[in-house]
């Protein structure tokens, strides 16, 4: 006699995604019940296992005819139990309360049978094999026993039963003792905790790589800027530009290369606008290298890379520009110069409107007290934004941004534990930045139309084209 497959096949489970109806959850539950009934008929066709079966112990080799009711055999430790979710149910049934898998085939365990947690099918298979002293044809393939194929190789299935600790001497009555249930819950929680720790380690590694790329690719960062603005640098303090005379002096030294390209004879506002463009082009180059270092970005289609940078660079520039600003002015020329806010406000229109909105944003952004590790993740999330116009692989980019935003959230919780609303505040800044860039692009178009001497750099002209 052998344990053969039942002609009644279990129904294949349905995936939740296949059902869009709000009744899908209840429908799936009913299908699960039908599946369990079908399986029970197929696996247990030889008869039900009642109380009388628990009395039958004498035919097993080595049995002393006794019933073990309080101990587990060493091999039946639940150490290999996978990590299911522990529902907050008060039901004492092990299968429903802990959602434990069968140690043999991975199906849902119906209880604690023969020393291990097992499903009804594997419990019945083991009982029949022992009671009838069945001997199966030897198999050397070490078949993997799963729910879908557990009836195909009885030899390997029985060997799996023995290897996980099933024993006819380990029968016991009643519910799982509280002490064992607590132990099993603790084991499951430990497994879940270990899995969470592993995921956290991966996320921290991603955050570290992005932060390192940020420090590597940008000449100025917040740490350097704050030291200079606080007057704590060991080098000479920055040269202060507060009027036209000091501006001319700075143009001969600090930004000489920027004004040596045919704009020397232009008026001060035009020269200032030209210098702003030069600094923007340098930052775009740095941002491009930083983006390439973001894990997953280089795998994108080249067109998608260009699109993400086109729409993201100015949002990133104004974010990082905040680190160089305080309420009185901003650092320029890698921290060697400082131009006052008041001087910029006194430039003639429309040039006086260029920087003031950036100062307003910077004061609010700096109030969040972010450091470079926070800003690096924020800038990476800005660049990898899946809602930019014209993207091809939107799904991949959205997953890329989702991972970065998740790392950002965890990092903020760790780095700023007392500010529980910092993450939503930072997400709001993404919205503010889009508005800021839109207004800036509109102002640049006004300058381009009204100021004949204020030519746009070719790279920036390409970025602004069809931007907003």
From Swiss-Prot:
One cellular-component annotation, GO: nucleus
Recite the UniProt keywords alphabetically. Activator, Biological rhythms, DNA-binding, Lipid-binding, Metal-binding, Nucleus, Receptor, Transcription, Transcription regulation, Ubl conjugation, Zinc, Zinc-finger
| Secretion signal, residue range per the UniProt entry | none
Q: Any idea which GO molecular function terms this record carries?
A: DNA-binding transcription activator activity, RNA polymerase II-specific; DNA-binding transcription factor activity; DNA-binding transcription repressor activity, RNA polymerase II-specific; lipid binding; MDM2/MDM4 family protein binding; mitogen-activated protein kinase kinase kinase binding; NFAT protein binding; nuclear receptor activity
Q: Supply the InterPro entries for this chain.
A: 1Cnucl_rcpt, NHR-like_dom_sf, Nucl_hrmn_rcpt_lig-bd, Nuclear_hormone_rcpt_NR1, Nuclear_hrmn_rcpt, PPAR-alpha, Znf_hrmn_rcpt, Znf_NHR/GATA
Q: Where in the cell is it found?
A: Nucleus
- DNA-binding segment(s): 99-173
Q: What modifications follow translation?
A: Ubiquitinated by E3 ubiquitin-protein ligase HUWE1; leading to proteasomal degradation. Phosphorylated.
Q: Where is this region: Required for heterodimerization with RXRA?
A: 304-433
Q: In which tissues is it expressed?
A: Highly expressed in liver, kidney and heart. Very weakly expressed in brain and testis.
Q: Name one GO biological process term.
A: circadian regulation of gene expression
Checking SUPFAM superfamilies in the record gives: Glucocorticoid receptor-like (DNA-binding domain) (SSF57716), Nuclear receptor ligand-binding domain (SSF48508)
Tell me what effect the entry lists for residue 122 to A: Reduces DNA binding and strongly decreases transcriptional activation
Q: Which residues does the UniProt record annotate as the domain NR LBD?
A: 239-466
Role, per record = Ligand-activated transcription factor. Key regulator of lipid metabolism. Activated by the endogenous ligand 1-palmitoyl-2-oleoyl-sn-glycerol-3-phosphocholine (16:0/18:1-GPC). Activated by oleylethanolamide, a naturally occurring lipid that regulates satiety. Receptor for peroxisome proliferators such as hypolipidemic drugs and fatty acids. Regulates the peroxisomal beta-oxidation pathway of fatty acids. Functions as a transcription activator for the ACOX1 and P450 genes. Transactivation activity requires heterodimerization with RXRA and is antagonized by NR2C2.
Subunit structure as annotated in this protein's UniProt entry: Heterodimer; with RXRA. This heterodimerization is required for DNA binding and transactivation activity. Interacts with NCOA3 coactivator. Interacts with CITED2; the interaction stimulates its transcriptional activity. Also interacts with PPARBP in vitro. Interacts with AKAP13, LPIN1, PRDM16 and coactivator NCOA6. Interacts with ASXL1 and ASXL2. Interacts with PER2. Interacts with SIRT1; the interaction seems to be modulated by NAD(+) levels. Interacts with CRY1 and CRY2.
Q: Which disease is it linked to?
A: Peroxisome proliferators are a diverse group of chemicals that include hypolipidaemic drugs, herbicides and industrial plasticisers. Administration of these chemicals to rodents results in the dramatic proliferation of hepatic peroxisomes as well as liver hyperplasia.
Task: List the PANTHER family hit by this protein, alphabetically.
Answer: NUCLEAR HORMONE RECEPTOR, PEROXISOME PROLIFERATOR-ACTIVATED RECEPTOR ALPHA
The protein's name in its UniProt record? Peroxisome proliferator-activated receptor alpha
Organism expressing this protein natively? Mus musculus
* Chain's gene name: Ppara
């Amino acid at each position: 006699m052998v344990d053969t497959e039942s002609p009644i096949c279990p129904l294949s489970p349905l995936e939740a995604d296949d059902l869009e109806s709000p009744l899908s959850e209840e429908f799936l539950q009913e299908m699960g019940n039908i599946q369990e009934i079908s399986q029970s008929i197929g696996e247990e066709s030889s008869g039900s296992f009642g109380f009388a079966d628990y009395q039958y112990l004498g035919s097993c080799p080595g049995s002393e005819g006794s019933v073990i009711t309080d101990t587990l055999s060493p091999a039946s430790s639940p150490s290999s139990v996978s990590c299911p979710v522990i529902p907050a149910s008060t039901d004492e049934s092990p299968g429903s309360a802990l959602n434990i898998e069968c140690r043999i085939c991975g199906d849902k365990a119906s209880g604690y049978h023969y020393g291990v947690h097992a499903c009804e099918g594997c419990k019945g298979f083991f009982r029949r094999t022992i009671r009838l002293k069945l001997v199966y044809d030897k198999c050397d393939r070490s078949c993997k026993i799963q729910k879908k194929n557990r009836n195909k190789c009885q030899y390997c299935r029985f060997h799996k039963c023995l290897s996980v600790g099933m024993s006819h001497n380990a029968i016991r009555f009643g519910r799982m003792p509280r002490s064992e249930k607590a132990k099993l819950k603790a084991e499951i929680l430990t497994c879940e905790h270990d899995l969470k720790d592993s995921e956290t380690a991966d996320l921290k590694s991603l955050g570290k790589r992005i932060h390192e790329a940020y420090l590597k690719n940008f000449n100025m960062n917040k740490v350097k800027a704050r030291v200079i603005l606080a007057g704590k640098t060991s080098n000479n303090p920055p040269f202060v530009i507060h009027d036209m005379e000091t501006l001319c002096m700075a143009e001969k030294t600090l930004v000489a290369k920027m004004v040596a390209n045919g704009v020397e004879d232009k008026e001060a506002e035009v020269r200032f606008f030209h210098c702003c463009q030069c600094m923007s082009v340098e930052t775009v180059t740095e941002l491009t290298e930083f983006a390439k270092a973001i894990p997953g970005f280089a795998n994108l289609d080249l067109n998608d890379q260009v699109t993400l940078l086109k729409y993201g660079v100015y949002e990133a520039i104004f974010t990082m520009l905040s680190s160089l600003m305080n309420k009185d002015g901003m650092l320029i020329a890698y921290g060697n110069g400082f131009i006052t806010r008041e001087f910029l406000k006194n430039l003639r229109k429309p040039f006086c409107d260029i920087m003031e909105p950036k100062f307003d944003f910077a004061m609010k952004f700096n109030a969040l007290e972010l450091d470079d590790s926070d800003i690096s993740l924020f800038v990476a999330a800005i660049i990898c934004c899946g809602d930019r116009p014209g993207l091809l692989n939107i799904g991949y980019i959205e997953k890329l941004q989702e991972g970065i935003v998740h790392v950002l959230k965890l990092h903020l919780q760790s780095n700023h534990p007392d500010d529980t609303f910092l993450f939503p505040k930072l997400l709001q800044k993404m919205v503010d930045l889009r508005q800021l860039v839109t207004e800036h692009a509109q102002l640049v178009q006004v300058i381009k139309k009204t100021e004949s001497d204020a030519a746009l750099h070719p790279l920036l002209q390409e970025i602004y084209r069809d931007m907003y």
